[in-house]
From Swiss-Prot:
Homooctamer; tetramer of dimers. This is Pyridoxine 5'-phosphate synthase. Keywords: Cytoplasm, Pyridoxine biosynthesis, Transferase. Catalyzes the complicated ring closure reaction between the two acyclic compounds 1-deoxy-D-xylulose-5-phosphate (DXP) and 3-amino-2-oxopropyl phosphate (1-amino-acetone-3-phosphate or AAP) to form pyridoxine 5'-phosphate (PNP) and inorganic phosphate. Pfam families: PdxJ. Its EC number is 2.6.99.2. The record marks E156 as: Transition state stabilizer. It comes from Pseudomonas fluorescens (strain ATCC BAA-477 / NRRL B-23932 / Pf-5). Belongs to the PNP synthase family.
Length: 248
């Protein structure tokens, strides 16, 4: 957990794999994207191995585990298949996320409060392999407190509602929800990360929230990389969030 206003950038490379899978080719290579991201200042690499394998594949994860210089944040659904795979690869960080086949992207946070026994068992099992387990949840006090009860050392607050807000009042309301969620998480002794839907025009307000440890960002980076290259996209984002955090 950071003790200053310095904030970490986790780069999600899922959508590099999305582009590859669209044509069933061997390119673009998400592993190369990860290495480029590290060179440009990424503090970690996030990948989500979905049940439907729509983007990242097992081979990608295995290769990344061998070559990353930073650390892997492995996003996964709470299924026996994924639990067994995580035990095999032993990533530094694991983030448990909700997952349905029909969704375009992760649509909301994990309902920890509604399934505490199941999530607690998963956290305990994954902690035994040495992984730091976080839970991807909405910035809701009930879910944050439940995350503490099940033994997770970290949470990732879902910023999608903030990213999707249309009017200034909606943006302010959703940003305040995140601010409050960070405060509750820190009061519970949790490491607080955040992510989902963040891009170059909305990230600074979130990066300026004191106490956030890491922001995980993917789609916006991959999209911007079409015009400036992946290293350039990551470097720009890193500069934005560090500047915003320094001003806070």
């Amino acid at each position: 957990m950071t003790t200053s206003n310095r904030i970490l950038l986790g780069v999600n490379i899922d959508h590099v794999a999305t582009l590859r899978q669209a044509r069933g080719t061997r390119y673009p290579d998400p592993v190369k994207a990860a290495l480029d991201a590290e060179e440009a200042g990424a503090d970690g690499i996030t990948v989500h191995l979905r049940e439907d394998r729509r983007h990242i594949q097992e081979r990608d994860v295995l290769l990344l585990k061998d070559v990353l210089q930073t650390r892997m944040n492995f996003e996964m659904g709470v299924t026996e298949e994924m639990m067994a795979f995580a035990e095999r690869i032993r990533p530094a960080h694991i983030c448990l996320v909700p997952e349905t086949r029909q969704e375009l992207t992760t649509e909301g946070g994990l309902d920890v409060a509604g399934q505490e026994a199941r999530i607690k068992a998963a956290v305990e099992r994954l902690s035994k392999i040495g992984s730091e387990v976080s839970l991807f949840i909405d910035a809701d006090e009930r879910q944050i407190e439940a995350s503490k009860r099940v033994g997770a050392p970290a949470i990732e607050l879902h910023t999608g509602r903030y990213a999707d807000a249309q009017t200034p009042s909606e943006v302010a309301e959703e940003l305040q929800r995140i601010v409050d969620g960070v405060a509750v998480g820190l009061a519970q002794g949790l490491i607080v990360n955040a992510g989902h839907g963040l891009h170059y025009h909305n990230v600074e307000a979130v990066a300026a929230i004191k106490g956030i440890n890491e922001l995980n960002i993917g789609h916006a980076l991959v999209a911007h990389a079409l015009f400036v290259g992946f290293k350039g996209a990551v470097a720009e984002m890193k500069a934005l969030i560090l500047a915003a955090a320094a001003k806070a």
